[in-house]
């Protein structure tokens, strides 16, 4: 510019100056910049002579050779500044080379020397129809304000692909491949003297004469790795609007780090990755500081900062102007599925307090700039869908207390697992003297028991059908998965379960053992002691003598002192008691005997061969029966019998034990000793 800007007249004059002198930095003669610059309609003196305000001085070489006539005609003072509209945007961070699935081999070429070809892919946004073409080893030319790129060979370009308007569109052209190994090493990068760009992505708006010449250009270079592979890196981006070429610069603080990989988020926790203003820490940042290009202030704090200081809060450099960038969207209807966003509402409510809100068109609302460009700032984790089992199958899953959202595998918990669960969780469930259950602390909703402790029997009711049970628990017939939420209610939307919980389904008997096992698994899950209320007695599963010797050390942890005042269940071959083979019990040495009106637990502590967990019953203590989820008796559920080792087990420590659901009719053919059940 130099001598040209010092002329007093504003007329256009043809000056014969070589294009490579004044419009290249550093110029061969004269000065590139004047002693002042104009920004926001104001005139400022240049503090740094020959210094580019918005980037490195070398970036000026990407602007091209005199795209328009110069000097510019000064606009009238009363004419407002016209905002340029960018119709196409290529997300340069998504530009990449993808290796083709099959290597291209020439005839007679060895397999080790096969050439590797790549596809070029990237993501772009467009508000109009656009035609995209990729050029290699191309030079740039401007003719009548229209940018064109000419490759050194006609084969070094792709076919033109048409796209409609849309956001987050993926450019992928499998028919077009590129092999950077065919070029010389100096051709992989950009050389200012040669003025040849290794890669040019040219996106031209195809919307008629109104936007004639409007285009977006992405310049890139290639790099070769040590293993012989290649990658592409973006160099610069340009926008041509109304015959003028604009160089796009980065805005610091506009990236959304919430959508990056988890590892990167963990590394950047200490960095400034929030969307709030760095001064007030409440409003959303929407004001850009120039010339340092830090997006770190809200409109209110930026207006205050103009009269208090003239330094950027981030880099402490003096700023010359403030640029507010606001994104707007149509207001969502009341029936819109989009959830309420507090950041959007806060920005909208705050903007109404300022006069700048008058520029908002009717029917639109202000949205965070970060959210408009990158989507939601804090996306909610995806909830896994409900897995529908077969008809009549009920799966009891316990609430998840961790971050693992995967469902546990379908398995049966062995007694070794139950013992480890009880010791790890530290749950020592003792027999309680209370006769009622609190509605707030119970996992299942129960009615308050008004029977006294002296009662020995309670009238038993029939268990409802599986379909009726699902209806009472709020489960639709289409999805019969039941989830026990941590709040105590049955939550169908929560689909996560702890790895220790059991999900059991039997194809032969729909309700044979799944409900009973899921109820027993509650004792070994992560449930606090206030969620499991008083029970009547304890059921100790029989085992072998070897197991009793191996597990004799943690005996005090599994024993609970019996207390007086408990109900005495009557002896009856009913579903209230589980049948135990007399032979196995005698071999174990358990002193469990039949009593007419005796307590199921002797005075003192009970010794068992296999140390299971003693739990309290969720029902009142004079009933030793299993109840359904609606507090009704499950007459169809067979209570667990003896522990049986799996045939496929390799060792005692690796055995997976299961509960054999024995039929009640088998109890008549073999000698059994009836004992109370505890789950």
Swiss-Prot record:
Motif (D-box 1): 329-332
Keywords attached to this entry: Cytoplasm, Lipoprotein, Metal-binding, Myristate, Phosphoprotein, Transferase, Ubl conjugation pathway, Zinc, Zinc-finger
Subunit structure, interactors included: Interacts with APBB1. Interacts with CHD1; CHD1-binding controls RNF157 stability. Interacts with ATRN, MEGF8, TECR, MSI2, PLRG1, BYSL, MTERF3, PSMA1, MRPS18B, PRPF4, FASTKD2, SLC25A1, SMU1, CNOT9, MRPS2, MAGT1, FXR2, EMD, PSMD8, HDAC1, RAN, HSD17B12, TXNDC5 and MRPL19.
Zinc finger map (RING-type): 277-316
SUPFAM superfamilies with a match to the protein in the record: RING/U-box
Family matches, as SMART domains: RING
Organism superkingdom: Eukaryota
Principal EC category: transferase
Notes on the domains: The D-box motifs play a key role in RNF157 stabilization.
Catalytic reactions of this protein: S-ubiquitinyl-[E2 ubiquitin-conjugating enzyme]-L-cysteine + [acceptor protein]-L-lysine = [E2 ubiquitin-conjugating enzyme]-L-cysteine + N(6)-ubiquitinyl-[acceptor protein]-L-lysine
UniProt-annotated stretches for the region Disordered: 339-362, 416-604, 650-679
Maturation and modification: Phosphorylation at Ser-660, Ser-661, Ser-662 and Ser-663 downstream of the PI3K and MAPK pathways influences the E3 ligase activity and stability of RNF157 during the cell cycle in an anaphase-promoting complex/cyclosome-CDH1-dependent manner.
Compositionally skewed regions (Acidic residues) per UniProt: 585-598
Places the protein is found: Cytoplasm
BP term (GO), one: protein ubiquitination
Function: E3 ubiquitin ligase that ubiquitinates APBB1 for its degradation by the proteasome and thus prevents apoptosis and promotes survival of neurons. Has a dual role in neurons as it is also required for dendrite growth and maintenance for which its ligase activity is not critical. May act as a scaffold molecule to regulate this process. Acts as a downstream effector of the interconnected PI3K and MAPK signaling pathways and thus participates in the regulation of the cell cycle.
Protein name: E3 ubiquitin ligase RNF157
PANTHER family linked to this entry: E3 UBIQUITIN LIGASE RNF157, MAHOGUNIN
N-myristoyl glycine-type lipidated residues: 2
Motif D-box 2: chain residues: 656-659
GO cellular component: cell body; cytoplasm
GO MF annotation list: ubiquitin protein ligase activity; zinc ion binding
Listed InterPro entries: MGRN1/RNF157-like (IPR045194), Znf_RING (IPR001841), Znf_RING/FYVE/PHD (IPR013083)
Triggers of expression: Expression is cell cycle-specific with higher levels in cells arrested in G1/S and G2/M.
Organism whose genome encodes this protein: Homo sapiens
Record-listed Phosphoserine modification sites: 660-663
């Amino acid at each position: 510019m130099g001598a040209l800007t010092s002329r007093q007249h504003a007329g256009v004059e043809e000056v014969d100056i070589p294009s490579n002198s004044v419009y290249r930095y550093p110029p061969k003669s004269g000065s590139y910049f004047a002693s002042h610059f104009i920004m926001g309609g104001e005139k400022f003196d240049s503090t740094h002579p020959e210094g580019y305000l918005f980037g490195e001085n070398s970036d000026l070489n990407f602007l091209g050779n005199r795209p328009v006539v110069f000097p510019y005609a000064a606009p009238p003072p009363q004419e407002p500044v016209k905002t340029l509209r960018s119709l196409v945007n290529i997300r340069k961070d998504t530009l990449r080379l993808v290796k083709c699935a099959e290597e291209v081999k020439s005839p007679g070429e060895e397999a080790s020397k096969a050439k590797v070809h790549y596809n070029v892919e990237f993501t772009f946004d467009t508000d109009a129809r656009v035609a995209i073409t990729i050029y290699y080893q191309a030079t740039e030319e401007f003719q009548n304000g229209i940018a064109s790129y000419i490759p050194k060979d006609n084969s070094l370009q792709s076919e033109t692909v048409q796209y409609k308007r849309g956001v987050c569109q993926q450019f992928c052209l499998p028919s077009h491949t590129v092999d950077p190994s065919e070029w010389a090493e100096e051709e992989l990068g950009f050389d200012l003297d040669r003025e040849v760009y290794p890669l040019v992505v040219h996106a031209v708006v195809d919307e008629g004469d109104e936007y004639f010449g409007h285009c977006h250009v992405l310049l890139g270079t290639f790099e070769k790795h040590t293993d012989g592979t290649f990658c592409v890196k973006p160099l610069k981006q340009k926008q041509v609007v109304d015959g003028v070429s604009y160089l796009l610069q980065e805005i610091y603080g506009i990236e959304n780090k919430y959508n990056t990989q988890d590892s990167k988020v963990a590394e950047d926790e200490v960095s400034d990755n929030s969307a709030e203003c760095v001064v007030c820490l409440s409003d959303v940042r929407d004001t850009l500081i120039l010339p340092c290009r830090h997006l770190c202030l809200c409109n209110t704090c930026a207006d205050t900062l103009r009269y208090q200081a003239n330094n950027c809060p981030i880099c402490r450099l003096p700023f010359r102007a403030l640029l507010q960038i606001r994104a707007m969207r149509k207001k969502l209807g009341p029936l819109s599925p989009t959830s309420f966003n507090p950041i959007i509402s806060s920005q909208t409510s705050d903007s109404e307090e300022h006069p700048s809100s008058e520029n908002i068109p009717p029917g639109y609302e202000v949205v965070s700039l970060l959210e408009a460009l990158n989507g939601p700032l804090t996306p909610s984790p995806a909830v896994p869908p409900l897995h529908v089992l077969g008809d009549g199958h009920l799966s009891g899953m316990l609430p998840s207390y961790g971050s693992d959202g995967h469902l546990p595998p379908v398995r049966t918990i062995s007694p070794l697992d139950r013992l480890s669960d009880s010791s790890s969780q530290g749950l020592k469930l003792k027999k309680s003297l209370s006769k009622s259950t609190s509605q707030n602390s119970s996992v299942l909703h129960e009615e308050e028991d008004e029977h006294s402790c002296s009662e020995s029997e309670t009238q038993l009711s029939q268990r409802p059908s599986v379909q009726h049970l699902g209806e009472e628990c709020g489960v639709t017939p289409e999805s019969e998965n039941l989830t026990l939420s941590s709040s105590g209610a049955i939550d169908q939307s929560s689909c996560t379960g702890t790895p220790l919980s059991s999900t059991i389904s039997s194809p032969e008997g729909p309700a044979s053992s799944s409900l009973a096992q899921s109820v027993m698994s509650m004792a070994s899950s992560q449930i606090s002691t206030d969620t499991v209320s008083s029970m009547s007695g304890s059921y100790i599963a029989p085992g072998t003598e070897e197991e009793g010797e191996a597990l004799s050390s943690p005996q005090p942890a599994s024993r609970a002192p019996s207390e007086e005042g408990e109900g005495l269940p009557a002896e009856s071959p009913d579903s209230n008691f589980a049948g135990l083979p007399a032979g196995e019990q005698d071999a174990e040495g358990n002193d469990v005997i039949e009593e007419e009106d005796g307590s199921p637990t002797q005075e003192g502590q009970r010794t068992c061969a296999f140390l299971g967990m003693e739990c309290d019953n969720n029902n009142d203590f004079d009933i030793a029966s299993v109840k359904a989820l609606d507090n009704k008796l499950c007459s169809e559920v067979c209570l667990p019998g003896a522990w049986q080792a799996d045939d496929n087990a390799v060792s005692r420590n690796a055995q997976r034990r299961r509960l054999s659901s024995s039929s009640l009719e088998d109890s008549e053919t073999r000698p059994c000793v009836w004992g109370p059940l505890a789950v």
